Amino acid sequence: MEKQALNLINLYNERGKRHGYWEYYYENGQLMSKGHYVNGNRDGYWEVYHSNGQLLRKGRYVNGERDGHWEWYWSGGQLEKKGHYVNGNTDGYWEWYYSSGQLSRKGHFVNGEFIKEKEQTELTMDEIAERFGISVSQLKIKK
């Protein structure tokens, strides 16, 4: 009951728009999402949860649009996908994962348009080095 009472403080601004910190709950009482509104728009860091309490997705909003790095998770807690948004559009490098944690595929977006996809087996030497945080010269190739 106290969590619900917290939601009743400063929910709306003088124009009747959502403003400030909000929490939403599933009917079972489990936290559904939490984050801030500014003048009716989501703004700042938000987290959304599966009904079992596991994190579903997290990321940042700017004036109601997704912006920056976002991550989604399977209901068991494993990473499902991650990537970037710019002004609400998918943009840049994205990765998708199986629920086992294994990389499924990766791709690249420009201003919301899907440009390129690579299978896991098509990683370049530069991409492998970047993933492990080392230089290409540090890679050791076994034949």
Residue ranges and their predicted role:
Residues 1-125, 131-140:
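Glycine/tyrosine- and acidic-biased, solvent-exposed loop/turn segments at the edges of beta-strands
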